[in-house]
Amino acid sequence: MQAEIGIIGGSGLYSMPGVSDVQEVRVTTPFGEPSDPYVLGTLAGRKVAFLARHGRGHRLLPTELNFRANIHGFKQLGVERIISVSAVGSLKEEHRPLEFVIPDQFYDRTKQRVSTFFGEGIVAHVGFGDPVCGEMAKVVKHATDKAGVVAKAGGTYVCMEGPQFSTKAESNLYRSWGFDVIGMTNLQEAKLAREAELCYVTVAMVTDYDCWHPDHDAVTVDQIVAVLLKNAENACSVVREAVAAMPKDRTCKCGSALATAIITNKDVVPAATKEKLKLIIGKYFGEQKAGA
């Protein structure tokens, strides 16, 4: 069974209500095992694949996530677009708990992550100036409006290593830099989705004010979970509306991100590397059709 739209559920969102014709699929990738089996089915008349980012039961730290396997697994299933739902802390007064942000920029503060499919004899530099698919972001913003959810379009998501939350010094530094929200996972997903030529958008659910706000307690796990439980229905409604409204065909440039990115002559790329990356680079090396 194939899918066209991928959904990544973050903290508090480990399943997607409303999906019919459900089939659970374990996918093995050249980069190892994804976080969990993918749940395939039909949502709002579209074929979707859902993945619990941290595994059901929330077993995996952000640093432990196999981001490459997660994204490659979606690619193997035929997915072309990914909606990533994530809990975030707010770095601005105007982004209140229970509200959503649809970031259009990311800033990387991670230290221990693998953020590329390339290496091992092949070099590629994809454009990442606009890390989010603009077409998807518009659809998601319209979906939040239709679902009656307060959401801001645009803003910067700073991705920290974790698993500890920020110090006040860090939180205030990020605020001084003008960042909007803080999380621990979406930067790697966005980079790898771009390399895999998949469209990607984040639906950031604000759960707290990190630790900077003088009138609010510093973030705790209990606080996050309580807000997420209240927000789960909103998140599912937004995803459902977005899936229903997503155009059938892509007219953005995400699907050709590697067209001018691969710098290594294909004749010198090791055979093992070619095989490992076949699904991603095959159409440029004349070894498969796009989307195969």
Swiss-Prot record:
Q: Does the keyword Membrane apply?
A: no
- Residues bound to phosphate are 11, 53-54, 86-87, 185
- Looking at the UniProt record, the site noted as Important for substrate specificity sits at 166, 221
In which pathway is this protein known to take part? Amino-acid biosynthesis; L-methionine biosynthesis via salvage pathway; S-methyl-5-thio-alpha-D-ribose 1-phosphate from S-methyl-5'-thioadenosine (phosphorylase route): step 1/1
InterPro entries per record = MTAP, Nucleoside_phosphorylase_d, Nucleoside_phosphorylase_sf
Q: Give the matching Pfam families.
A: PNP_UDP_1
Stored CDD domains: MTAP_SsMTAPII_like_MTIP
- EC number(s) stated in the UniProt entry for this protein: 2.4.2.28
Q: Which keywords label this protein? A: Glycosyltransferase, Purine salvage, Transferase
A GO molecular function term, named singly, is: S-methyl-5-thioadenosine phosphorylase activity
What SUPFAM superfamilies has UniProt attached to this entry?
Purine and uridine phosphorylases (SSF53167)
The GO cellular component terms are: cytosol
Reaction(s) the record says it catalyses: S-methyl-5'-thioadenosine + phosphate = 5-(methylsulfanyl)-alpha-D-ribose 1-phosphate + adenine
Q: Where does substrate bind?
A: 184, 208-210
An example GO biological process term is: purine ribonucleoside salvage
Q: Which family does it belong to?
A: Belongs to the PNP/MTAP phosphorylase family. MTAP subfamily.
Q: Quote the PANTHER family the UniProt record gives.
A: S-METHYL-5'-THIOADENOSINE PHOSPHORYLASE
Q: What does this protein do?
A: Catalyzes the reversible phosphorylation of S-methyl-5'-thioadenosine (MTA) to adenine and 5-methylthioribose-1-phosphate. Involved in the breakdown of MTA, a major by-product of polyamine biosynthesis. Responsible for the first step in the methionine salvage pathway after MTA has been generated from S-adenosylmethionine. Has broad substrate specificity with 6-aminopurine nucleosides as preferred substrates.
Q: How does this polypeptide assemble, per the annotation?
A: Homohexamer. Dimer of a homotrimer.
Name under which the protein is recorded: S-methyl-5'-thioadenosine phosphorylase
